[in-house]
Amino acid sequence: MYSSEKGVWRNTEEMATDELYYQGGVLWNGDLHWISPWNFSACFDVSNERLRPLRYTIRTPEFEEHGGDWYFGESGGHLFYIRPNEPYGMLLDFFELELERDCLRWNFKYHVDLTPLTTLYPQMIKEEYDPTFDEPCAFNIIGFLVDDKEKKTTLVISLADKIISCDFNNLTLMELADV
């Protein structure tokens, strides 16, 4: 752990974390969280300076493993995880980490089909790809915003030439920027 006040590094308690992929960690409720595609995650408890393993179960209506993790982030005090639910990446499942009986669980929140967006934004699909090694999707999820007060849920998507937002509640699209 690094102390910016003292300018020194020091060791904290060790934990075997071979299954963990330390990229794209997210700060949530004062702790740092990492997720891996192997049903394993970890949390660095900042106040106790301790790395804790978190085993979790992802409950989905139709659990199938397709592709990797597409988004892991915090919004409105909630921690979200988004991943594809079919091999072409246009059907997405959204999960929220919640505390249930002193146990953290990923609970299914939304099932979203982005296929209708390809009519307005055909650049969401690659013109050429090898289905053996590649996904046809040509977009990235760069944000998932939840506003509990306004009851708004918005997905922010980066395309090759623009950034768009999709409001789930009133089913509207907005072009945020040309890239």
Positions of predicted regions on the chain:
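Short, conserved recognition motifs on repeat-domain binding surfaces
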Residues: 1-179
